[in-house]
C-alpha cells in the first residue's frame, strides 16, 4: 500500500513537534542543520522529497522536516 504523507496535525507528529520545514524550527533540542534526510530514523536515505521514517511507520515525512526524535547519522 502507498504510504500517506504525515500531517503536522497528526497527534504523534504534534507530540514530537514534527514540522515539514526544519528551517523555521525554534525548539530547544533542535541542532542547526538537522533534518529528516540526515536522521538515522529516516529509513531510506536515498528518498527524495518524502521518505519513510521508523517513528511514523504508516506515513512519509518531508526530507527537509524535523522532529524531536531526530538522531544524527553517525
Swiss-Prot record:
So where does [4Fe-4S] cluster get bound? 36, 39, 53, 67
Recorded GO molecular functions are: 4 iron, 4 sulfur cluster binding; electron transfer activity; metal ion binding
PROSITE patterns given for it? Answer: HIPIP
InterPro entries according to UniProt: High_potential_FeS_prot, HIPIP_sf
The keyword Signal is assigned to this record: no
Ordered alphabetically, the record's keywords are: 4Fe-4S, Electron transport, Iron, Iron-sulfur, Metal-binding, Transport
The yes or no answer to whether the keyword Electron transport is present is yes
Q: Which GO terms describe its biological process?
A: aerobic electron transport chain
Family annotation (Pfam families): HIPIP
- Family of this protein: Belongs to the high-potential iron-sulfur protein (HiPIP) family.
Q: State what this protein does.
A: Specific class of high-redox-potential 4Fe-4S ferredoxins. Functions in anaerobic electron transport in most purple and in some other photosynthetic bacteria and in at least one genus (Paracoccus) of halophilic, denitrifying bacteria.
Subunit arrangement? Homodimer.
Query: What name appears for this protein in its UniProt entry?
Result: High-potential iron-sulfur protein isozyme 2
Amino acid at each position: 500500500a502507498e504510504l500517506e504523507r504525515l500531517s503536522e496535525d497528526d497527534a504523534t507528529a504534534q507530540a514530537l513537534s514534527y514540522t515539514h520545514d526544519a528551517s523555521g524550527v525554534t525548539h530547544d533540542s533542535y541542532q542547526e542543520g538537522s533534518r529528516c534526510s540526515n536522521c538515522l530514523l529516516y529509513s531510506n536515505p536515498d528518498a527524495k522529497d518524502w521518505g519513510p521514517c521508523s517513528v511514523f511507520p504508516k506515513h512519509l515525512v518531508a526530507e527537509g522536516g524535523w522532529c524531536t526524535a531526530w538522531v544524527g547519522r553517525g
